[in-house]
Amino acid sequence: MSHRINKVAVLGSGTMGAQIAAHCANAGLEVLLLDIAPKELIAQEQARGLSLESKAVKNRIVNAGLEAAKKIKPAAFFSPRVAGLITTGIFDDDLEKVSGVDWIIEAIVEKLDIKRDLLARVELFRKAGTIVSSNTSGIPIKAMAEGMSDDFRKHFLGTHFFNPPRYLKLLEVIPTADTLPQVVAEIADLCDRRLGKGIVFAKDTPNFIANRIATFSSLNAVRVMIDGGYSIEEVDAMTGPVVGRPKSASFRTTDIVGLDTALYVAENLYAAVPDDERRDVLVPPDFMREMVKRGWTGNKAGQGFYKKQRGEGGKTEYLVLDYNSMEYKPAQKVRIPSLDAAKAIDDTVERIRTLVYGKDRVGEFLWKTISANLIYTSNRIPEIADDIVNIDNAVKWGFNHEFGTFELWDVIGVEKSVAKMREDGLEIPPLVQKLLDSGKKSFYEHREGRTFYFDVATGDYKEVEPRPGVTILKSIKEQTKVIKKNASASLIDLGDGVACLEFHSKMNAIGADTISMMNYSVKEVGENFEALVIGNQSENFSVGANIMMLLLGTGRRVGRDRHFGAAVSEREHESQVFGEACSRGASRHGAGRRLRDHDAWRQGSRLG
């Protein structure tokens, strides 16, 4: 469907604009990157005798944005060569070139009047039928298009990328009442298939889906922290990997985003939602406002909730803010018995259930924050989205959470949690009451490799539509298509003469069982299949060899170099044979199908 989009214009070369341009180039699209011209010369330009009319001066801002994207970590480009697909220019001289592109993406400063002025200029040169979108994180899409031509409004929508665009999977697509359905479908198809994004369809409401929920969630956690006398280190220890969230947890995430940015988003949201039943939570506490006044805005300022400095002997040491005294102190490792015990539980579901219903400080904090977030998010349907699937995907893909809001509700148990909410005097959302009144006990059901979600409109389960061309191994296995398995690996029949060797040991480390299944797969695929895919849908493809298990599996004694070398040599030979067999199968079959994880790209978490 998206075959006609081959050239893109990105308007704005700031952090987001330049990285969006980079990722479009990664997908093989030609990109025109434009920005404003400088109004003053810098010292170096004056020394060279340049003027404001010199091209080097005019393109200074846009070229600097592109150069920053080339150097940013993690890398915005697949390869340095890809940057050659990007051409730079300025609005005053080069805006007419948008007449030759297929998609125009606006990514300038978050001010409605400035965006509208630029889009009005774009309309002078844009050819009819060209798609135009805005990367705004919360300005109403409809307001930007007001007064534009009928053709412009029909081809205009929001496309909210999350930072960094290459790594965070989420793309919120926000149509208006005027946007043509085929335009929405074309952008969604392009961004899914070529840009690798996870598409969520949001309504044109303040901050859309992900940032609406995240703003409430983060500020509510701060409120619970203050009321309960928790430290910043304690909160981060309770809101990170132990509950299926990134290592950056709560406050390290805000340091990455920038506290000034986070408060700007919160203040705009507060002004835009006068009828929000929890609007009071959107008011940041005084200590956070004071941090911004002092310039303690996070990593970009060198200090925020955390501060890194050189200690004695040049050793790096980390400090953390005491929000009561507004002084930094050495960060302490958090030691809470229930947290330490929970870390020994491998299963995230069981770990969360254990912690959230705990009777200690950890349980109290997690219950108060999670229950409030569940209720708040449930009350946002149908305001911000029509179904729970789009909301859950926005939370997972935008912030790298293992579970979306309604998936998390299933994890802790709908009936059990609702009973506790009632004990606490909390009001149960109509959506949840409707679920329970219908006799259902969960928001999702899984049957024979298919996933169903509770549909608010019908009050019944509705199947989550499978994505064409995407294979989900869990679903395939639930359809009893496993040829053979052991504790570390499985051989799965994908259909069409293709088998898949999936690793599923702890962290997908390769041990004796994995190699045994490799050897079996070579023989089985050679006799009964056309091709073999080696893949899995875990966070790690493989962390490498489990040397201890490999050695034990060979029957050799551990600790002697000659035995170690012999074992490795033998395994290298087996791996070579295995690889050659896979190559033969792949060359016979061709490119094969897409094998991709819905929840991949867990590379950090930050607001878009």
Region annotations inferred by a language model:
Residues 596:
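Conserved divalent-metal-coordinating catalytic cores
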